[in-house]
């Protein structure tokens, strides 16, 4: 028996071939059925998992009343007003910080100026000490020079006196020798005055010179003492004036030191105020962030947004 099966191209089959084709078709249909069953099972598992996950997510409670636009607008206005106040506080804190920076710069300059003035006064005091030493040296040198001149003059006078005394003593010795000779020869009628009458003019002249030299010596010594007595008070007055000025300079140094300490304290206060303003700005920013975050969560909860 022959069966003709039409496909895309005409094929002539026998009975055995037909049985083989039928068996193959049955196998393929069984496999297709198994595949469809597996797909249905997978879809069922996915749907069960999806339903299980939906059952685990908590459902939000639906609002019992509708959205009030007026309240929403009012809430927005309150939020804007609060944020405006907080931003104003932030701006004030920023301005205060800028003022603190300026004040710190001013106090830094004041501290530096006070320290420079203090150093200048110390230098002035050192110069005064040098001036005092110079004045003392000048007065000492002047006294030394004056004393040297006086001593030189007195030495010269002393030498002249020694020469005159030696001359006078020599003449007296000659008179004594002459008297001894006259006594030896037995001539006692000649007196000492008669013998000394020969050298009397020289003796009188030398004695007068001695008196003048002695007077000159005393005058030189008096002048030296007077000069020393005059220069010592002048030196003391100069030193006293320098010491007074030095005392004023030391007082100025102390005053500048106090000003420097005050400026340093003011600088520390300015830095503390700046730290306070920085912390205040951080607190305001954190408050703004917390307020906006809380308002956002409240709005999400009001609209049922997860």
Curated annotation (Swiss-Prot):
Coiled coil start-end: 31-44, 253-273
GO cellular component, one term: membrane
Family under the similarity heading: Belongs to the SctB/YopD family.
Residue segments, region Disordered: 29-57
Location within or outside the cell: Secreted; Host membrane
Gene that this polypeptide is encoded by: sctB
Bias-annotated ranges (Basic and acidic residues): 30-43
This protein's record includes keyword Transmembrane: yes
Name recorded for this polypeptide: Type 3 secretion system translocon protein SctB
Keywords: Coiled coil, Host membrane, Membrane, Plasmid, Secreted, Transmembrane, Transmembrane helix, Virulence
Subunit details: The core secretion machinery of the T3SS is composed of approximately 20 different proteins, including cytoplasmic components, a base, an export apparatus and a needle. This subunit is involved in the formation of a pore, called the translocon, in host membrane. Interacts with YopB/SctE. Together with YopB/SctE, forms a multimeric integral membrane complex. The C-terminal region interacts with LcrH.
